[in-house]
């Protein structure tokens, strides 16, 4: 019951909470510079992470050109490992928001744009990014990754 009331209270706070309170700063973002990057090297970088969507740029990390949809790119790449794999087919246009947008407005934007990541810009300067996961964590608390979850068996080991 305590968790339920906390979630309800957090959802009511969404109209007051702003993106600037929950976004990931640019310095902590994982991004990829596509300039002069071979497809093989891109695959190597992607496989070293667990991200399904990665902001990408050419030369200037403040000018994100889009969000690489990893699953789409890898499917195309594995289907045709040649230069014919068009990277642009796997990059979606970024959804851009102001740091002063409320969480309510952000969620509405995520739904309308059919996106899960928004880039946070102020005066054409990239401040960071905010994800649907950030919003959910604000609502229900920290979300554990699958690898962080330890199954509970209910049985204790006997010594």
Task: Describe each region flagged by the PLM.
Residues 1-159:
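Cytosolic regulatory modules rich in charged/polar residues
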